[in-house]
Amino acid sequence: VSAFEPPRYTTLTDVGVKRSHNQDACAAKPAVDAATYASCGHIFIVADGMGGHAVGEKASVKAVRDIPHLYQKHVHEGVAVALRRAFAETNAGIHEIGQQNPEFRGMGTTSTALILRPEGAWIGHVGDSRAYRIRGNTVEQLTFDHSWVWEIARRTGVDPDELGDFKRNVIIRSLGPDPEVEVDIEGPHPVQPGDVFLLCSDGLTGLVKPEEIGAIVNVLSLESAVRLLVHLANLRGGPDNITVILVRVPGGPQDADSHHRSSSPLARFRRTLSRHWPVWTILMGSAAALLSLLFHLQELKTVSLPLFLLASLIILVGIIGLVHSILRAPAETSGPDIPLTDPEMEQPRTLNIYRQHDCSITPERLNQFCEIEQQLITTLKEHNISVDWDTHAQLAAPADGDLRDAFRLRCEAILLLADAFHKARHKQESFQPSWTTPNQR
């Protein structure tokens, strides 16, 4: 992303159905200006605590608070180094708390941080929380699960799904239990306008398929999409806390109207003029100086001398503006802003995409969501739960053969019904329908 424009993002964390306390945490720290964006970038982070109610919550909150702060503190050393140091120092701090307080012994947390900068997307990662990139009809998993299942799958060369559910929730790497931790640093992944990045705890990915995630994100606003994703996880049992962050890179289809307005010929001319005014000023001054020379050769000194002085002044203003633009360039450049002292950038980095999923909207996926809607309608009516049925009827109108629009309407209808279910769930915790849980994580 070449020019500074704040990304659109939304966050949501939910305790789930079965848990009494929320041990997840998340934070968003978008850059406030172009200089901060170029030096630090936009920061987003999720964490999934473990070790008991208060213990896990303390660990995850500390992670989402300390990692962004420490990253910003060390970013002058390079992005990769800063991320690694931020995770390592946070791990040491959590571990020390566990060692000094017997009631906190064994406290830990996963953590996945996303840094969006001019050169691309960086990810720091420990545990089995995940980062995805949704681009068009493809969902890409950008992190490796530090779980027993994924490690065995890596060593044996098989798909993690082939190992079933045995020890699926056993993680082999987290912040806190040990004095040192190995941190995965991914990136910088190229970023395109309209890309959506998703960070989440395993409370989402254990119950909602990546294909479903991508399809939902592609048809709903970020705010509606994050609510529907959390609702789906809860409707399918909600055994764990659920946390989701969605970040949309500016310039995609959702920004088409504003992009069109800013891309008019007059707007482009104004932007070009504002960016390159020092050069134009110097050229104008040079033209005036040349004209004064012609007047001088024609012995029109009363005209040539004032014109030459004016030309000199114009050129001087242009040179001052050019120097000022050069000094400001590092804060607004579209290229990488990676210090040469960063030892991890001396060699080309491998951009890992651990899994890819097709999230195209198909008739089968539409039918699946129609079934979810019908199951939800039946359950809500059986329990006499109040719903705005008039609004639901409007959403049930046919989409005239447009598959994408039909899927969007089904998502909006499910969201309306799930909101009502969510309110009733808090009043009557024993009310739980039986939902189909996908096998793939």
Model-derived features with residue positions:
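Hydrophobic/aromatic side-chain positions at a characteristic register within alpha-helices
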Residues: I361, P398-D402
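PP2C/PPM-type serine/threonine phosphatase catalytic domain
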Residues: V1-H383, V387-Q394, R408-E412, D419-R441
